[in-house]
Amino acid sequence: MELKRREATPKTEEETQGLYFARTKKENLEFISSGNFLLDCVLGGGWPLGRMSNVVGDKSTGKCAVKSATVLTNEGFVDLEDLHKHLPEGITPFEIELAISKGNKTQTSHFYKEDVMEYVHVETRHGYTIDVTPNHPLLVWTKDCETVMKRAGSLEVGDIAVISKATHMYNQDSDLDINLAFILGVLVADGINPRHGRIDISTRREYLQELVYNAMLSLGVKPFLRQHNVGSLDRRFTQQVYNLLGCPIEFTARNKYVPNCVLNASFEAQAVFLRGLIDCDSWSDNKGLYYYTASEKLATQVQLMLLNMGIVVSRYFKDGSNIGEKFYDHKYWTVSISGRYFNLYSELIG
């Protein structure tokens, strides 16, 4: 047998750049192609199937996130957990416009759902977090002063996450009234569950009482005003608000959240919701504004809503809190707005 040396065919740029990552492809795993050769190499073969949400688009726009993640679309913020509940196992055609960065959007094509055994929790010093599969590429600024896509599983302490702000993507087709949005904000902050048959918001701040009272009047609702609370006994309005909240069973401090009708609303409605929410449960000093909540989900949602508006905040917690003479042994979250972002908050939200 005669062996002949064969001249190597010159490799394309894609083949050369992807050679290292191609070697790391895992055996015995199924993948979905991202539609981009280099991205498939970075991922080790494509998008790995798992108990995750794969919102798949072109180039680096796909997501391999666990169901707790939130994405920003032309219909507003969408919790992948909500999609996870309503879509079947496997791959489903799924088209929605997805925000990638400021001024950059893309159209998704599919949603994939399946079991995954491993994921990586990534957290920045400002409290921005994401839970993704180890192969998921994230854009980072490295210690070597380079902007690169790195697998989540290979991130190091000191890598700087590149996070887009001021994407300004809202659902302008939303018909949520701004007076109703304000009432929802105050209710989420200091209200009881409307399932008890009334709207009842505890506050001694006279200016807040007046704002809620007038907002209800503008909606044609008869309000009541007392020394320590404001609300309404209007059954039809109470049921409307309860439905907008998603008919919650638990509505205590640790179970509060931003309703989907607000996450999917216009900028104006989101801004007045945040104004009502934060005015009720915040304090300020000469350094900034501090919003306080017992709900991790609510703190995270507020952080993302503000980021979309261009307001960068810090989110952190402390274990336990003394309220009056009683000690509550669970986490309390703070969203801190300071510096020029406090000025921007005042300008956009008030």
Features from the language model and the residues they span:
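Generic start-of-chain signal for non-secretory N-termini
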Residues: 1-5, 66-72, 162, 174
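The Walker A/P-loop phosphate-binding site
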Residues: 2-64
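Short, solvent-exposed loop/turn positions at domain surfaces
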Residues: 41, 77-80, 146-150
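Short intrinsically disordered, low-complexity coil segments enriched in acidic
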Residues: 64-73, 303, 310, 344-350
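Long, charge-dense accessory insertions within large macromolecular proteins
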Residues: 65-109
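Intein-associated homing endonuclease modules of the LAGLIDADG/DOD-type, together
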Residues: 86, 109-325, 334-335
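Polar, glycine-rich mid-to-C-terminal structural blocks
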Residues: 327-345, 349
